[in-house]
Amino acid sequence: MKISFVPGTTGIFCLFLIPYMFSIIFNGVDSTLINKKFDTEMILPIVVASQIEENYELETIKAQSIIARSNLYIKMKEQKNLADTLSQIWKDIKSRSFYLAVIQPQYEKAVEETEGKVLTWNGELKAVPYHQISAGQTRSGEEVFHSEDEAYLKSVQSNVDKKSKDFLNSVYINKNVLPERIEIKSRDSAGYVTEILADGKVLEGEAFRKGMGLTSSNFTIQKSGKEIRFLCRGKGHGLGFSQYGGNEMAKESANAEEILQYYFPEMDVLNIKSVNC
C-alpha cells in the first residue's frame, strides 16, 4: 500500500468512531442499530484506502468504493449491531497491516461520488470479491465454491493483467520443508490450482497458496537445485474484480459502473435505498 505511514496513528481511525462509542456506552449495544445510526459513508474512505492503492485512477477507486460499500452492508446485515461491525472492520484493516496517517482526498471523493451505490444480484446484496491482478482470466464462482449460490460470479477475460510488472512472481522454498512428493492434481478453467497432492494427501489449492505464502494459486512447480520454485501468475485469489484490469479500463475512459459491469456481468449497480437489506 503506497500511502504514508506513521507509527501510532490508530487514533485517526478511533476519532471517526467516537460518536458511536458514546452511543453504545450510554444507550447500550442493542439500542445502537446499524441501519439507523451508523453512517457507512463516513467509514468507507478508510475501508477503501486499505483495499486499493492511491495511485489508481479515480474511476477504479470509485469501483472499489461500490464493492466496499456492498460488502460492508452485508457485514452489517449479518452482525446486526454496531459494536460487532466496527470490531470486524478494524480487524480487517489491521490484518492488512494498514495504519492510516492521512486519508488521501481521492478516497473521500470516490465515496462521495458513488454515495449509496451497491452491487446486487436479482435485487439482493451478494458478497463481491476483488483481487489485485488476475492470471489473465477471472475465476468462476460456481467452479471455485462448487455451488450455484455463487454462480453470479462469472469468469471473464482480463488479458491486460499480463502486462503488469507484478504479473509473474517466483517463490523459492527449500525441499526440506515441503512434502517429499508434491504435484498438481487439478485446475479450474482459469488455470488456478484447485487441488494439489502432497505425499498422497489432497490439499485445496487456495489453502495451499496461503500456507506457502504464494501470490496466486495459478502456479507451476519447478525443481531448482535444493529448492522448489513456484512460478505464480497474478496476485490474489482471482475471483471478481481485477483492480489492475479495471484500472487499465479506466485509463481508456471507462467509468466505475462500466468497469463493474464488465467484471460482474450478472450484477447490477443500484442505490442501497432500493435494496432489501
Where in the sequence are the language-model features?
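Conserved, single-site charged/polar hotspot
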Residues: M1-C277
